């Protein structure tokens, strides 16, 4: 009986491969099946660690949402900068028509190499996204934002016309079409979304995101980004303190949280994160206001240490590598060995 089942299965598999191409169905225990997920760094050391794989996963849909001026676009521009550092190609679908090239450049984005589209309708934006994804030549596509993806019927209609559920239907249809192409081309697609208030909610959070529920289901990672305070020097505001919560994560354990500083005209402060995580792991010693590294004093007060790390990038890189090894690579190697044991058990 078992033998007949095996014969029937192998006949079905060969029929599927003939009809739909090699690799349509694979055994998870096969050595050819990649279990490793490629990631693109977010530009934030703490967030890379919170995501569990060292960044945002390629071949997946990611949603980043939060209130206005919380750092959503800044975070996505940092992702573009990191992607370009690795020699990748990035595209920015600017549905809000609000991209500032000079600000992007300050964050490290190679503006001359960035593909930008400012579509007229939501349908056009999503069609352009699909074509870029299917080309398999683009590594990251950012859609800014879901709220600005206005259906054609709404644009061509009168001001007071009712268009209930049009945008949600558009998103649902587009994501059904996009999701398989994204996986096949190994492209990271990031949707930036805004927050709206639900009326008449008595219990639970009244907050919701725009564009219906489809994106919540299709996204492998959802990030909730909030501004929690200001960074001041005297009366002058230099930037904002930001908190990011990993609300959903299909590639690693979710609900992790991290905080980082976004400095105006500079972006996410890598040095501040290195100081915080370095102190946490006892790589940097803190005694009163003084900070020491390898028994050498490197500055008094966090701001002076930040400037020291900025002027000594080799020290910053060394510390970052130690932090990544301690918090990320050790975890990943444990997960990898556990996963290999699991697949060996399944194969047996």
From Swiss-Prot:
GO cellular component, one term: cytosol
Binding site for ATP: 66-73
Keywords assigned: ATP-binding, Cytoplasm, DNA damage, DNA recombination, DNA repair, DNA-binding, Nucleotide-binding, SOS response
A molecular-function term among this protein's GO annotations: damaged DNA binding
Subcellular location, principal: cytoplasm
Segments traversing the membrane: none
Subcellular location: Cytoplasm
Pfam family, one: RecA
Family to which the UniProt record says this protein belongs: Belongs to the RecA family.
Protein name: Protein RecA
Origin organism lineage: Bacteria, Pseudomonadati, Pseudomonadota, Gammaproteobacteria, Legionellales
